[in-house]
Amino acid sequence: MSNDHPQGQLPASPARSALKGYLYVLGSILLVTAAQLGMKWGVIQLPTWQMDLAVMLAHPLPLLVILAGVGCYALSLLCWLAALHSTPLNIAYPLLSTSYALVYLLAVNIPLFAEPLEPGKALGVLFILLGAVLVGIKPAAGTKQTG
């Protein structure tokens, strides 16, 4: 019996591949959210924002958190590229937009950011989430798509 697959590995099923793609999208969302919040925290810990290495080196913890945020961005990019390999862009991209909502909701609810909850912004977040859902909905069977 011939086995074309490496020992112990089964061929990837479409469902398994799709799940993997969604997990990569989720990883990208969570990492970019962590990057935004980490960099925000790091920047607000500095006495002033300057591209002055001496100021940054005098505050090593905020600098490390900012650099960790940049690292999270890099990892997020890797997750995003992996997600694009197995997830249609018209599904992955709207899901990625949920990171905007997640960053806002966390910044409002985590006291050290002290972001105000504003009705207009909250409505905007709701529209982002609603848009992501609407773009991701598949048409009902038998429904003709235009375009």
From Swiss-Prot:
UniProtKB keywords: Cell inner membrane, Cell membrane, Lipid A biosynthesis, Lipid biosynthesis, Lipid metabolism, Lipopolysaccharide biosynthesis, Membrane, Transmembrane, Transmembrane helix, Transport
Topology relative to the membrane: Multi-pass membrane protein
Keyword Lipid biosynthesis listed: yes
Pathway: Bacterial outer membrane biogenesis; lipopolysaccharide biosynthesis
GO BP annotations, alphabetical order: lipid A biosynthetic process; lipopolysaccharide biosynthetic process
Subcellular location: Cell inner membrane
InterPro entries, per database record: Flippase_ArnF, Small_drug/metabolite_transptr
Periplasmic topological domain residue ranges: 45-62, 115-121
Native organism taxonomy: Bacteria, Pseudomonadati, Pseudomonadota, Gammaproteobacteria, Aeromonadales
Protein name in UniProt: Probable 4-amino-4-deoxy-L-arabinose-phosphoundecaprenol flippase subunit ArnF
Complex and partners: Heterodimer of ArnE and ArnF.
Function per UniProt: Translocates 4-amino-4-deoxy-L-arabinose-phosphoundecaprenol (alpha-L-Ara4N-phosphoundecaprenol) from the cytoplasmic to the periplasmic side of the inner membrane.
Gene Ontology cellular component list: plasma membrane
Family named by the database record: Belongs to the ArnF family.
A GO term, aspect molecular function: carbohydrate derivative transmembrane transporter activity
Major location (coarse): membrane
Entry keyword Iron: no
Sequence intervals crossing the membrane: 24-44, 63-83, 94-114, 122-142
SUPFAM superfamilies with a match to the protein in the record: Multidrug resistance efflux transporter EmrE
Cytoplasmic side: 1-23, 84-93, 143-147
Top-level taxon: Bacteria
Gene that this polypeptide is encoded by: arnF
